[in-house]
């Protein structure tokens, strides 16, 4: 009797892990220093390496992508009740970050081909209460950053990009984190690059970096001075080391992800009721 060959699943996303021995070797010094959190040497090293990799001027590491967005919005100090234009086609975290800052999300429709926010519909949603736009890059497809930033400049709005799906993406040779007033990244275990849990805020502003440095550490500026109502949103050293290890392999992992997307597109091409997103190279 011939046994039927077991079919193997092709996972679109599966947590990328560095070689076990490599990670273990890097965490050994922690048993000597006992410095496990509070912006230790590995936290600082990862900030520097990601700043270079993502081609951004400033980068602040945080405990996850959600807190990165929530604190980036908090740092802008918008008046309570102000409106923020965003997309409903995103993980719930995007909307939660707006609402938790006591702001009102205003949903803008998306484009059917790449699922990013439809920039042609943004201006009709702007009111006297609008203070910002939070566009979301989707599945590696980036928003129309040029049009969005023209609209923002015309109406005096801030732009905070949710770039959780856009690690390593570039536009006209600029890292995607260079656009807007800030861009947030997620390093969750499901992402193509992960620190187990983690996130970051990229920007051109040193002032924003320093503001986030305080906010993610309970608003503490010094032993005797608390200048903001912050929270504990610091990345720990074990997560930072995972990030340092995984950064060596992220280019390979991105290529693996691209091959899987190609395979899915090929296998689903004959199904008339399905349409996959358009991806620009």
Model-derived segments and spans:
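PLP-dependent aminotransferase-like
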Residues: 74-163, 170
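Phosphate-binding glycine-rich loop
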Residues: 35, 39-83, 97-109, 174
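Structural detector of well-ordered beta-strand residues that form the stable sheet scaffold
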Residues: 60, 85, 106, 159-160, ...
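N-terminal "arm"/small-domain region of PLP-dependent enzymes with the aminotransferase-like
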Residues: 1-36
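Active-site PLP attachment segment
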Residues: 178-214, 237
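Conserved active-site segment immediately N-terminal to the catalytic lysine
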Residues: 161-195, 222-227
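PLP-dependent aminotransferase class I/II
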Residues: 41-49, 53-59, 120, 124, ...
């Amino acid at each position: 009797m011939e046994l039927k060959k077991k079919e193997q699943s092709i996972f679109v996303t599966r947590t990328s892990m560095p070689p076990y021995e490599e990670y273990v070797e890097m965490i050994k010094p922690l048993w000597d220093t006992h410095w496990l959190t509070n912006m230790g040497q590995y936290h600082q090293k990862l900030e520097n390496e990601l700043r270079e990799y993502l081609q951004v001027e400033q980068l602040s590491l945080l405990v996850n992508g959600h807190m990165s967005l929530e604190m980036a919005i908090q740092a802008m100090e918008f008046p309570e009740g102000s409106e923020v234009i965003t997309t409903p086609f995103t993980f719930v975290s995007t909307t939660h970050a707006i609402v938790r800052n006591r702001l009102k999300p205003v949903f803008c429709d998306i484009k059917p081909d790449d699922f990013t926010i439809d920039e042609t519909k943004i201006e009709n949603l702007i009111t006297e209460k609008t203070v910002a736009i939070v566009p979301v890059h989707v599945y590696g497809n980036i928003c129309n950053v040029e049009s969005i930033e023209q609209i923002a400049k015309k109406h005096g709005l801030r732009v905070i990009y949710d770039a959780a799906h856009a690690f390593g993406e570039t536009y006209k040779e600029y890292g995607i984190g260079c656009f807007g007033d800030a861009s947030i990244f997620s390093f969750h275990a499901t992402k193509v690059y992960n620190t187990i849990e983690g996130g970051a805020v990229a920007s051109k502003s040193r002032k924003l970096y320093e503001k986030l440095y305080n906010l993610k550490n309970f608003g503490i500026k010094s032993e005797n001075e608390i200048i903001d109502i912050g929270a504990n949103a610091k990345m720990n050293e074990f997560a930072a080391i995972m990030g340092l290890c995984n950064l060596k392999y992220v280019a390979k992992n991105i290529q693996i992800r691209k091959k899987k997307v190609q395979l899915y597109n090929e296998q689903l091409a004959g199904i008339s009721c399905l349409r996959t997103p358009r991806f620009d190279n």
